[in-house]
Amino acid sequence: MPFLHGFRRIIFEYQPLVDAILGALGIQDLERQEPLDDSASSEESRILVLTELLEQKAHSPFYQEGVSNALLKMAELGLTRAAAVLLQSGANLNFEDPVTYYTALHIAVLRNQPDMVELLVRHGADINRRDRIHESSPLDLASEEPERLPCLQRLLDLGADVNAADKNGKTALLHALASSDGVQIHNTENIRLLLEGGADVKATTKDGDTVFTCIIFLLGETVCGDKEEAPMINRFCFQVTQLLLAHGADPSECPAHESLTHICLKSFKLHFPLLCFLLESGAAYNCSLHGASCWSGFNLVFERLCSHPGCAEDDSHIELLHKAETVLDLMVTSSQRLQLPENLNIHPVGSLAGKIQALHASLRQLESYPPPLKHLCRVSIRLCLRPWPVDTKVKALPLPDRLKWYLLSAHSDTQDTC
C-alpha cells in the first residue's frame, strides 16, 4: 500500500537525516519545542551547523527526501532562514507529507506562518495547488480560521486565484462561510478580505450551495438552538449579509430555500432586523428571477399573520402585527407603483382578524388608485437615501419633524390615500 510504504520510508530511510537536520537547529521535539534563541549570533551559528551537515550528507541515499521532509518541519515552525538553506540544498517544494499529503505551503498556512508562505511562493511553490485528500488550496485553508488572516492577506498579495474552485465548485469564499459558526469561529474579516480581493458572490457549488447557504443554516440554528448563542449568531449573520450585499450579492434569487429574503419573510418576527436591513438595502421582496409568480413577500407576510389566530390579550400576536405593518410598509415604499400578487387572498381568524383585513384592504386600495403625490415623494426620498440605514439618514435631514415622521418606515398611515 502506498500509504504504508511512505510511512516506512520515513522510519527506515530518510528519518535519520531529518532528525540530524532538526538537531543541528536545536530542535529536539516538535510537539514540545521551546522558542529558539533568535539572537543574530545564535541563528547564524545554527545555520552554519546546518550548512555543514548538508554538505556532509549531500551524497547520502535518500538525501532529497530527507531535506524535503525537513522543509515541512521548517514550514510548521516558521524558520525561514533554515527553509531557505534547505531549498538551496535541493529540497523539493512539491514534496508531500506522507500522512496528510500536505505540501510545505499548505503546512505554513495551517500554522499561520505568512513569512514562510512568501518565501515558498517566491521560490516557486504553486500558490493554487490543491492537496490530494481534501482538494484544499492554500487560500481555502487560510480562509477557514480567523487566526490565519495574515496568511490570507499574504496569499492574495502574492497573486492567489481568489475564485479558484475545487471539483465541487467550492471557492475560498464558500470555505470561509461554511467554516463559520457565528459563536466560536467568526470569519467576518476573512470574508471581507476575500470580497475586497474580488471573490465572486455568485459562486455556487454543484450541490447548489451559495454564499447565503451558511447564513440560512445559522439562522435556523437560532430558532431551536442555545438561546444564549442566538444573539451572537444573529449579529454574525447580519454583519456578513452587509458585506455580501455591499459586493453585489442577490438575496432574493431562486430557489426559495436558498433565498435569504424568502427565509426572513417567512419568519419575519424572528428575523425582523435582518429583513428590514435587506428591504432597506434594495433586496427584492419577490423572486428576483421570476417575480411574484414564483414567490411574493406580500403572500408570505399575510400567510404568517393568518396562521397565528391569537387573542385580544396576546402580546405576541400584537407584536407580530406591528412587525408585519413595518415590513409591508418597507415593501410599499420600495417602488413607486404598488403591484400586489394576483393570488393574494386572505382568511384571517381570531380577534385581530379585522385589523388584518383592514391592512389587506388598505394595500388593495393603494394599488387600485394612482399613487398620491406624497407617496411618490416618500418613495423617491427613501430610494435616494439607500442603502441601509435609511431611517437614520432620514432623521439627519434638515426637514421639519412632522415630515421626517412621515418619511420614516412604518410611521405613515397606509390607509391614507389622499
From Swiss-Prot:
ANK repeats lie at residues 65-95, 100-129, 134-164, 168-203, 224-253, 258-287. It comes from the Eukaryota. GO terms for biological process: intracellular signal transduction; protein ubiquitination. Keywords: ANK repeat, Cytoplasm, Repeat, Ubl conjugation pathway. Pathway: Protein modification; protein ubiquitination. It holds the Pfam family Ank_2. GO terms for cellular component: cytoplasm. InterPro entries: Ankyrin_rpt, Ankyrin_rpt-contain_sf, ASB6_SOCS, SOCS_box, SOCS_box-like_dom_sf. Residues 358-413 form the SOCS box domain. Detected in adipocytes. SUPFAM superfamilies: Ankyrin repeat, SOCS box-like. Its main location: cytoplasm. Probable substrate-recognition component of a SCF-like ECS (Elongin-Cullin-SOCS-box protein) E3 ubiquitin-protein ligase complex which mediates the ubiquitination and subsequent proteasomal degradation of target proteins. May play a role in the regulation of cell proliferation and autophagy by promoting the ubiquitination and degradation of SQSTM1. The SOCS box domain mediates the interaction with the Elongin BC complex, an adapter module in different E3 ubiquitin-protein ligase complexes. Belongs to the ankyrin SOCS box (ASB) family. Binds APS. Identified in a complex with ELOB and ELOC. Interacts with CUL5 and RNF7. Interacts with SQSTM1. This is Ankyrin repeat and SOCS box protein 6. It comes from Mus musculus (Mouse).
